[in-house]
UniProtKB/Swiss-Prot annotation:
Belongs to the RecX family. This is Regulatory protein RecX. GO terms for biological process: regulation of DNA repair. It comes from the Bacteria. Keywords: Cytoplasm. The gene is recX. It is found in: Cytoplasm. One of its GO terms (cellular component) is cytoplasm. Modulates RecA activity. InterPro entries: RecX_HTH_1st, Regulatory_RecX, WH-like_DNA-bd_sf.
């Protein structure tokens, strides 16, 4: 299969829409049918212009997920792994942002935004489980959730 454009042009087109990790960009170019030499050359050029930077991508992605409350702790690490970010880079990005974001504040904001009328003490078991599981899927530890809901009043 002969590609219509070169890998460099395709990489630029992809990066003009959104940020990619290097591994994700490599996968996208492979799906487009480019051979490994073309892909490596395109990625090298992207790195030289700083268009692809896994550290920057990990920080941006982690900041977005933390700010929105979509992932914390293990869920955040799992998301970065899913985006093909190496563990050491992901851990560094998460550690750098720990000072900026407090899990307690993220939890409080998320609960106020997502469940404004929820009261853990008066809620029935089904509602408690629903809210608790929603927050667990976002990476909050059970101990943190129990502490938050016991101090909520």
């Amino acid at each position: 299969m002969a590609p219509r454009t070169d890998a460099w042009s395709s990489a630029l087109r992809l990066l003009s829409r959104r940020e990619y990790s290097e591994a994700m960009l490599r996968e996208r170019l492979q799906r487009k049918g480019f051979d490994s030499d073309q892909i490596e050359h395109a990625l090298e050029r992207c790195r030289s212009y700083n268009y692809v930077n896994d550290e920057r991508f990990a920080r941006i992605r982690a900041r977005q997920l933390l700010a929105s409350g979509r992932a914390v702790g293990p869920a955040l690490m799992a998301d970065l792994r899913h985006q093909r970010i190496g563990d050491s880079i992901a851990r560094k990005a998460i550690n750098d942002l720990e000072e900026e974001f407090s899990q307690a504040e993220i939890l409080k904001d998320l609960c106020q935004r997502r469940f404004p009328d929820f009261d853990f003490q008066t809620a029935d078991d089904r509602s408690r489980r629903r809210v608790f599981n929603y927050l667990r899927r976002r990476g909050f530890a059970s101990a943190v959730l129990f502490q938050y809901f016991s101090e909520e009043r």
